[in-house]
Every structure is written in C-alpha cells, then in structure tokens.
C-alpha cells in the first residue's frame, strides 16, 4: 500500500548493553513485519485534523511573512501527509499491541509500578475524543499535560484576539500508575530517602531547540529538550520508546541521547530521508564508530 519500505538504524554500547535507534519508512500498521520488541513508552504527535488550515494564522502562509507578497507555497497546506485519513482507532489498536503488558504487582506503597504508558500530543479540541477512543482499547486512565510557550505562531491574529501559546498532550495508561521517575532514591531496605524525589507538575515550559543542533524538519516538530524531559520521567535507561508517527524523528534523537532504545515509523519518504540525514546521522555515525 505504501510502496517499498526502508529501515535504518544503529547500535551502540551502554554499560555492556546495546542501545538501538531505528527509523522505518512504513506505516505503523505494518509493525509485525519488523519484529519490534514491546515498548515501555509510546509517544506520538497525531494529526490534528485541521487539514489545509495548519498555517492559517501563521505568517508563513505568505511569502516572507507579508500578505503584500502573496501566498507562499505553504498556503492551504496540511502539516501531516495523513491529516485527511489518519485512523485513530487503528492507532490505539497498534499501541495496545506494542506496549508491554501490565505488571502483576503494583508498586510499593507511595510509589508507582513499572506499568507502560503512552503520551499523545493533540489539539485541545481533540482531548475528549482521544480519551474516549483510548478507553475503548483498554486505556482507562489519563493525565492531561499542558506546555506553555513564550511565543505564538498566530501572529496574523495578534491585533484581533487572544492568541494560542500552549500545546497539549495526554498520558494514557491501562490500570496501574505507569513507571514514574522523579529523582526518588531508596535505601538498602527499600525505604524512601528523605530529600530525594520532587513534584513534577502537569505543565512544562516549551523551549525551542537550538536549530544548529536540532534542525527544523517537520512543521509540527516537537523540541528534543521537551521530549527528553518526558522520556526521563516515564522510562529508565535501556527501556524501549516507540513513535508511530515519527516525522522528523526528534523522539528517536531524544531517546538515543538518554540511552533508551527507540523505534519510529514515518510513511513520508521525504521526511524519512531528511530525518536520517539531519536528525539521526550524528547518532548513527557515533554508533557505527563504537
């Protein structure tokens, strides 16, 4: 259906363990072909279903950001190739199959278990719909996340109304609270060490990446720094992270820098090639050298 597929990645050693980073040019629905292991965390930015209006309030709609110059090539364009045919039911079916099973035992009193979870970035208007679909596939629980920017892309509306400067996501999990790492340490008796561990609020600062380090590839690209924060909270080194809608592969880059195994799917050949060349190339070179 999607033509010839490609997969490229690399391995490197971390404490005598091999860490793998692999991006696959195929639809996530075909995951069985690739023998991918079960994930501790699935994290993805699903299409927002706003179609041709993605750049609607953004100056990028016009050449050089000025309406006097006429419309740019981005006018009337969607951010995602799948913005018109993304099947959220199939997405949750995939996630349910690829996440690890629930642990039999809950965590110690006052601590989380090692259960897996998924994080879905979505539009504010999609939150209730995403939660309802998630429940149908066994993800009964959710935690909302808010990301606060110090800028807004809606420049063209600045003198007309309040502009958007937030992004949203949901942490979805089945039954037990998912693995949670907040810096808490335990002693040899398994008791919490005072002074370790800290509260993690459900809002985060959205800090833009340094473009010289992390090039902009995809219009809806999420900052590597932010993704690293989330990955550190819900996984340990050596765990597996999967991004079914990888785009620019920033999730894979973030996971690799934190010594997590990662796999991603991207159906666009163009984004796949750019991600390999610009986002993952340094990682793959390091892995090859090691």
Question: Could you say what each language-model-derived stretch is?
Answer:
Residues 275-276:
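Conserved SAM-binding loop
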Residues 1-272:
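Core catalytic lobe of class I
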Residues 125, 280-290:
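Class I S-adenosyl-L-methionine-dependent methyltransferase module
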């Amino acid at each position: 259906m999607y033509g010839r597929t490609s997969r490229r990645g690399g391995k490197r050693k971390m404490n005598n363990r091999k860490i793998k980073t692999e991006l696959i040019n195929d639809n996530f629905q075909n995951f069985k072909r690739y023998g991918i292991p079960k994930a501790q965390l699935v994290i993805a930015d699903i299409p927002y279903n706003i179609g041709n209006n993605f750049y609607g309030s953004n100056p990028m709609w016009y050449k050089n950001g000025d309406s006097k110059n006429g419309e740019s090539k981005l006018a009337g364009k969607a951010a995602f190739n799948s913005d018109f045919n993304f099947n959220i039911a199939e997405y949750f079916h995939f996630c349910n199959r690829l996440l690890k099973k629930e642990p039999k035992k809950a965590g110690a009193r006052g601590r989380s278990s090692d259960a897996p979870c998924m994080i879905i970035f979505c539009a504010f208007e999609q939150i209730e719909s995403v939660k309802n679909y998630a429940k149908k596939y066994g993800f009964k629980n959710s935690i909302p996340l808010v990301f606060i920017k110090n800028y807004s892309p809606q420049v063209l509306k600045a003198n007309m109304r309040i502009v958007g400067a937030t992004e949203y996501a949901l942490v979805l999990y089945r039954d037990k609270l998912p693995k949670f790492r907040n810096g808490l340490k335990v002693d040899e008796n398994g008791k919490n060490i005072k002074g370790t561990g800290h509260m993690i609020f459900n809002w985060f600062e959205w800090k833009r990446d340094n473009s010289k380090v992390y090039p902009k590839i995809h219009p809806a690209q999420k900052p590597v720094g932010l993704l690293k924060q989330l990955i550190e909270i819900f996984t340990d080194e050596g765990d597996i992270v999967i991004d079914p809608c990888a785009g620019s592969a920033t999730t894979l880059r973030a996971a690799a820098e934190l010594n997590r195994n990662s796999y991603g799917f991207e159906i666009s050949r163009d984004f796949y090639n750019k991600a390999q060349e610009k986002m993952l190339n340094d990682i793959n070179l390091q892995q090859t050298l090691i």
